[in-house]
Amino acid sequence: MMNMQNMMRQAQKLQKQMEKSQAELAATQFTGSSVQDLVTATFTGDKKLVSIDFKADVVDADDLETLQEMTIQAVNAALTKVDEATQKKLGAFAGKLPF
């Protein structure tokens, strides 16, 4: 069984690695799009919205509902990518905890 000092050292090491991974995620951009890429949304890994882009074909004042639906699709697709990358990068730390 590990002594307390070794457990604390290992926990501090894991914390530094996790902070580094979180910073890498925050610096990464994730883009999601709607059907036919008419709307794209880009977020950082810490879920800050960077941009929403609309193709001219989708902007129709008489059909705002379609634009809204496509925007939601693009945002949700981008956030799903962020969540998947976060789980992949940070989920590995859960199994490494010394206790």
UniProtKB/Swiss-Prot annotation:
It is found in: Cytoplasm, Nucleoid. GO terms for cellular component: bacterial nucleoid; cytosol. Its main location: cytoplasm. Keywords: Cytoplasm, DNA-binding. Pfam families: YbaB_DNA_bd (PF02575). GO terms for molecular function: DNA binding. SUPFAM superfamilies: YbaB-like. InterPro entries: YbaB-like_sf, YbaB/EbfC. Binds to DNA and alters its conformation. May be involved in regulation of gene expression, nucleoid organization and DNA protection. PANTHER family: NUCLEOID-ASSOCIATED PROTEIN YBAB. HAMAP family: DNA_YbaB_EbfC. Homodimer. Belongs to the YbaB/EbfC family. This is Nucleoid-associated protein SSU05_0194. It comes from Streptococcus suis (strain 05ZYH33).
